[in-house]
Amino acid sequence: MDIAVSSWSFHDELYQGKLRLADVPYRVHDLGYGAVELQDMFLWPRPPNLIARLFGKKAPPFNQYQHDRRTLLKVRLNRLRSGTRLVCWTIDSDLTVSEGPDRQKQKAYLAAAIETADFLNAPLIRMTLGGEKNDRSAYGRAVELMSSVLPVAMARKVKFAVENHDGLSSDPAVLAEFVQHFHSPYLGVCMDFGNFEGDRASGMQTLAPHAIHVHAKSREFNAQGEETQIDYRMCVDALKSAGYAGAISIEYEGHDDPAIGIKRTRDLLERYA
């Protein structure tokens, strides 16, 4: 089982400024894991050194849609030095926006994400569809935008993994339909154990055959070590039945010590492997 750790597992420390994205690979390595998933939402530019700050220089403003090259270089170097593999570069996209400046912004964002994934040696990009559930016009716009960016990703040998998340992709049948529309080895599903609104077992059976990346979400555990809201046996069985052989990225969403939450999640995955 190829287990990775998502930077989201350290969300409290990242938001509080106690940890920087570039240092996550070292943190993951120190916890005993060899693979990491990183999110661009934490790609805040590094502050200038002390001397530069004394002369009044400030860090450039954070722009999630325009990746800071200096910060990316630090991420890349730290990942290499830590000896960890980057299994996924994670972005929050919206393929359903209407024509106009916002849609052009999304196209530029996706192009930048592909370039960044290539620069960081990430084999795939986790993305979101956006939109509102059951909005077929939004679905059509998502298909149109994916049609324009998928060839760019293919040229860089970078895959897209669309997560079952809010909006259009919250319906497993719609997400499966979207992926099947393209029949491309460069487009699949990022299946998140926790993001199912209805019957989780049915949703997983729908999405698991299309999964090219997986998020093992967790929040709280009982005395037996089981996740209190998610049946991990069922989730792992669904992956095994589908013949899934890719990475499983731990996303600990709780607020306790991440090291403990991550380990408990790994223990569950290995218990039912």
Predicted features and spans:
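Histidine-acidic metal/acid-base catalytic patches
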Residues: 1-35, 50-54, 121, 147, ...
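Active-site acidic/histidine proton-transfer and metal-coordination neighborhood
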Residues: 66-188, 198
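Conserved beta-strand positions in the central sheet of alpha/beta enzyme cores
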Residues: 37, 88-90, 126, 161, ...
